[in-house]
């Protein structure tokens, strides 16, 4: 794997390989989301429909994934077409530059909501193009009901608590089936989910990604 535009940086816990977001098109390790067939894309941080309430990407082109994650996404598309014809993956976030991760972290300063945002000092896996946020849309293009919204920072969003939510009625069986379908498509394709966000999926082990992959600034 090649690193483009290496930048030295102080105050980092790992010897990150860094690249400016503006240079990403020149790096062959990354693929545009538009090159992945049969997905829908609505990058929520490129608009105001997010927990910060403003466009965080501006002129930055963030519709990219590392080619390994893009290949996993393609596998998920194939699996979903076979097992739930007419349904598609809707990508809500993919590459997230480190400078944007800092803004998210700072926005939640002093709150207990920081559990939902990776500490920039460690590096978000989004910033390596190795994570994505996604949901599903039906054949009519409507988002499936997952029981909580994207970036909803409540316990209803926690996959590890789904059994409890089903028992109390906080999550319906249909909502749970929708989450299971999303997880099945992505986790059978090489991604891993996390405990507190049903929409978030990562490729490979975090420490390996942070040590070996290019972080986009």
Predicted regions, residues:
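Segments that shape or occlude catalytic/ligand-binding pockets
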Residues: 97
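Aromatic-lined carbohydrate-binding/catalytic grooves of carbohydrate-active enzymes
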Residues: 101
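Conserved metal-phosphate-binding beta-hairpin within the catalytic cores
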Residues: 201
